[in-house]
From Swiss-Prot:
It comes from Lactiplantibacillus plantarum (strain ATCC BAA-793 / NCIMB 8826 / WCFS1). Inhibited by pyrimidine. It comes from the Bacteria. The active site is at residues 244, 329, 331. Its EC number is 6.3.5.5. Residues 169-356 form the Glutamine amidotransferase type-1 domain. Keywords: ATP-binding, Glutamine amidotransferase, Ligase, Nucleotide-binding, Pyrimidine biosynthesis. Coiled coil: none annotated. SMART domains: CPSase_sm_chain. The lineage of its organism: Bacteria, Bacillati, Bacillota, Bacilli, Lactobacillales. This is Carbamoyl phosphate synthase pyrimidine-specific small chain.
């Protein structure tokens, strides 16, 4: 079935449809990973976006039951060069085509995704649509289409739920979390309580947490202003750790600014340097916004990590509080596990804070 990928600037790419047969509109973004398409499609950080893969063959190992990063994918569409006709993997449960149909996500193939990526890198991120027919007003209608900005509310859990264990009590504030974050914390025996994105500081502190995690999520951090007051209050009392969107919200809550990147970081080969040690980790990333480096000068935040290629702020730490964040995904999924030691640093921070509190009680 003939379909078209139409960009906001009027560029049109003809291709062949697969997945759901509906039309769609979203921001077109590209992922440079050579694998991990299942984890990416089910990552809530892609909510509202049309996800394009630069690797030329997608779907060759199918979709399995284990690697979902969320229950329901929310990306608006999938763009590939070629979809594998047959999936070959012992865990394969269904084809990519069937999975997209099942979840009402349209796809388009036979697209030169590397050429489209070069176009996006030059022109910047823009809206796009996948349609069966290009009409005279298709581009004009695309230009005036307002994309949904309430994506965090859509991606977050509506109800609190536990993931019990015997270790430290960690409250996870869900802005669109990946299951791999919960897995990494569970590996370290954290007793988890996952809460909606709009939970207040008083509601969090009523659970007597040993630490608070701010997860990844979709969209512009400035569209979640209610989280900032919660962060400002919580960081005074217990260790706090933010990832991706959580990192950006942590920065905003402490007086820094964020900005929309030209085309973002989406892939899992991004080199990040830890400034204090010079250690370099290859990291998994998925973000279209970043912290403004210059805006940090008048805050109590210190830069701990930076992206080697373009200098993006990749890590922050508070001068006075036991609070820190990273822009990248130390949980990987997909990608390298170079940076999973960051979770151990969170565990150590909680242990040190508990020891300090016990010492204060003893001295009193």
């Amino acid at each position: 079935m003939k379909r078209y990928l139409v960009l906001e600037d009027g560029t049109i790419y003809p291709g062949t449809g697969f997945g759901a047969t509906t039309a769609t509109v979203g921001e077109l973004v590209f992922n440079t990973g050579m694998s991990g398409y299942q984890e990416s499609i089910t990552d809530q950080s892609y909510n509202g976006e049309i996800l394009m893969f630069t690797y030329p063959l997608i779907g060759n190992y199918g979709i399995n039951r284990d690697d979902h990063e969320s229950i329901k994918p929310t990306c608006k569409g999938v763009v590939v060069h070629e979809v594998a006709r047959r999936a070959s993997n012992w865990r394969n449960a269904q084809s990519l085509d069937d999975y997209l149909k099942q979840n009402a996500i349209p796809g388009i193939m036979d697209i030169d995704t590397r050429a489209v990526t070069k176009h996006i890198r030059t022109k910047g991120a823009m809206k796009a649509t996948i349609v069966d027919n290009v009409l005279p007003d298709t581009v004009d209608r695309l230009k005036v289409t307002e994309l949904n900005r309430a994506v965090v509310a859509q991606s977050s859990t509506n109800n609190a739920y536990p993931n019990p264990a015997t270790g430290p009590n960690v409250v996870v504030v869900d802005f669109g979390l990946k299951h791999s974050i919960l897995r990494e914390l569970a590996k370290r025996q954290c007793n988890l309580t996952v809460l909606p994105y709009n939970t207040t500081a008083s509601e969090i502190m009523a659970l007597n947490p040993d630490g608070v995690m701010l997860t990844n999520g979709p969209g512009d951090p400035k569209d979640v202003p209610g989280a900032l007051e919660m962060i400002r209050e919580v960081e005074k009392h217990v260790p706090l750790f933010g990832i991706c969107l959580g990192h950006q919200l942590f920065a905003l809550a402490n007086g820094a600014d964020t900005f929309k990147m030209k085309f973002g970081h989406r892939g899992f080969n991004h080199p990040v340097r830890e400034i204090a040690t010079g250690r370099i980790d290859f990291t998994s990333q998925n973000h279209g916004y970043a912290v403004d480096r210059d805006s940090l000068a008048q805050t109590d935040l210190l830069i701990t990590h930076e992206e080697i290629n373009d200098g993006t702020v990749e890590g922050l730490r508070h001068r006075d509080y036991a609070a820190f964040s990273v822009q990248y995904h130390p949980d990987a999924a997909p990608g390298p596990h170079d940076a999973d030691h960051i979770f151990d640093e969170f565990i150590d921070l909680m242990a040190a804070n508990q020891a300090t509190q016990k010492g204060s009680q003893f001295n009193a």
